[in-house]
Amino acid sequence: MAEELYTSGQYLEENPAWHTYESPWKIAHILPMLKKHKLEPRTVCEVGCGAGEVLRLLQGHLDADTTLWGYDISPQAFEMCKERANERLHFKLADFRREQDTPFFDLLMVLDVIEHVEDYFSFLRDLKSRSQYKLFLIPLEISVQGVLRGKIFIQNRNRYGHLHHFTKETALRSVEDLGYTVLDYAYAPEYEMESKVWQTNLMKLPRRICFACNQDLAVRILGGCRILILAQ
């Protein structure tokens, strides 16, 4: 079962920081999307919140009365969340889909989660009625460069548990096919983040230059990007 990767402690061994270093970058893309659509959520939930760092950072940009909840199935991630909890930031070790007593949230965030879920169609279908707005962050791993390298898909499967791979078009279509209305989307280029991987750093300049010229073409050919989708 895919869930064992996250509940057994194996994922923490492979990723001891649980991607907290990516959280400021994610916030830098989430906030402009909320501002653009004049969204000021008073209740926020993140499904698959990991260490809870995104919620902790987001809380500092929202109204002081905003209530935030984070759910994750990993006991190890939940332990990391505990040190970030406060009066209005709560975390729960649970599968959000099986929770029946949750409120209807203003905003539900699913950030870098869909690619990990065995049946992401049922997963997305179960979330649709749980909030007014949704934010999905999905890695776009299918690119010419990725296909030519070949091994990247298996490497991401082994280390990160990525079971599914997307292009911009398949990510948007997957959301739409399940009855969501896509209100907006934006690319989130990974070259903005620091990296200790030399191959990633080598690709930063060409990705940045190509992205400035033609975003769609750059992502299709060179990859290294995610898509942030706002939906209802």
Where are these regions (language model features)?
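Short, glycine-/aromatic-enriched active-site segment of Class I SAM-dependent methyltransferases
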Residues: 14, 137-162
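Conserved N-terminal segment of class I S-adenosyl-L-methionine
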Residues: 1-104, 111, 121-126, 158-160, ...
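Conserved helix-to-beta-strand junction in the class I
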Residues: 126-130, 137
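Short catalytic micro-motifs in class I SAM-dependent methyltransferases
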Residues: 109-116
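Helix-to-beta-strand junctions that scaffold the AdoMet/dcAdoMet cofactor pocket
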Residues: 117-118, 131
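Short beta-strand-to-coil "C-cap" segments at the C-terminal boundary of structured domains/repeats
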Residues: 230-232
